[in-house]
């Protein structure tokens, strides 16, 4: 596989992936994928699908930290079939119980990628049978630990980020990377999956980090910044960067798994997607940002200060931010250059 397509190992001829998928252009000049659109109860590729997948390597670690790899044997492949059979028999009831997502993927800039490139139409399609089985068992146990459900939800999110069909293999360090190593849904020609032991270790670390992470007297409030009424000497903000990252789409990946647990832990919360409330487009972005920063300015003293974390590669967006600050009654007194963590 190259950036140009699939290369034949015999003749070295390259065939674009779009040709293999059977993509076509409709009457409105939109590219339409030729892939089969998965049904709600699907969790695996069908035999006659253009794409399919198979287990082809297993990584082992010895007690002294040594690593080795081998191809799956008959027992491994039989286990895979057994897992698929279990999921096939339970997927509908799991969805009804909220143990596995039943939420459809809504069309959007980022979410269209998995629909177009794989035919996946529901969020659970981004997880294979073994991953669905493991995560459904975790949620089952979480529902019995109501006292710690809040911790469990955060740890679940960490787990689904590290246990999906979008987790790539880092050949340099010989380990798998999480789903969101950048802010996108990148479908892969080969991906990795964790074992129960590896997932438990990650889960345990998440619980420990979360329980130790917040100490002292803190208050966390989920509120529209335009409605904030507290006064403060300093406001520190990390605003969205125009349309650079579609958080309203990406967050639905987690919401699909969290829905039942959120309803049990916080019954007063609204648990559907709030995509419709996302600030999109230059006009709405500027208007909303001015309202937010004007409100913050009105709730700090004359000698107060605001620190704004803002990274963007488009100079026009920086000019837009400067106008927003000025129209909000602020003036820039200092600026620091930083290196961002991703190039997305």
Residue ranges and their predicted role:
Residues 238:
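Substrate-binding/specificity loop regions of serine endopeptidase catalytic domains
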Residues 232-235, 306:
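Generic beta-sheet signal
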Residues 267-333:
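Conserved Class I SAM-dependent methyltransferase catalytic core
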Residues 1-233, 244-274, 278, 292, ...:
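Nucleic-acid modification enzymes, centered on SAM-dependent nucleic-acid methyltransferases
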